[in-house]
Amino acid sequence: MKTRTLLLSSLFAAAVAFAQSPAKTNTASASANFPPIGGIHAHVCGIHFYSGDMARQIIAEHYCSHLSDEVLQCVLYDSNKPGARLIGVEYIVSAKVFESLSPEEKKLWHSHNYEVKSGVLTAPGMADAAEKDLMKALIGTYGKTWHMWQVDRGDKLPLGIPQLMMAFTADGQAKANIIAERDKLYGSTAAKKMARADIADAKHDPGADGWQKGVAVQLDLKTVQATAQQLRRSE
């Protein structure tokens, strides 16, 4: 209950900070008639890598809304500027929800403990105290992330099938140039790490971050036989 209350209060603080930002003020009227978009109340920036290929790392801007006190949903963009490309989605669930998932399902999810403690995860534009409260709420959660647009390889369109993404779990995994690029946008990752040193580590479910065991999960495209019902409808 304490964690749930903290998550809700942190999300409220994020909503207030986001609502007061110039970007939100300027676009509020434009999104007023689009309730799902109007429900976005937090902006978080993280760095993902392709499951099975840590060499491919990408900064992702998350714009999030909450479905309940246990589930968040985020749309992901490749920048925070007008004309940004929508590259994916991330679903975030509480530890309680994650524990209820099957072993096979858990392989698709990543933990957020290291992202929070390392400073890799940040909430742009939010006051330091409010951001820290949000990170305390997120540290024990788990994310399931799909990227549909592989902008890192120069694709001009969202080509191919969705790609499962993962998050860092230890020092030395994030590329120095990626961290430097993100630091130019939102301040020192190292400073955030120091400021969060007193945040307690979350209990880690071994079902998440399966790639650490040496076997990563990724999608593959296959051809399936159309059903008789589908064929009849096409006639």
Which residues does each predicted region cover?
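An exposed acidic His-Trp-rich patch
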Residues: 80-166, 170-172
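N-terminal domain-onset segments
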Residues: 5, 20-71, 82, 135-235
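Hydrophobic h-region of N-terminal signal peptides that target proteins for export
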Residues: 11-19
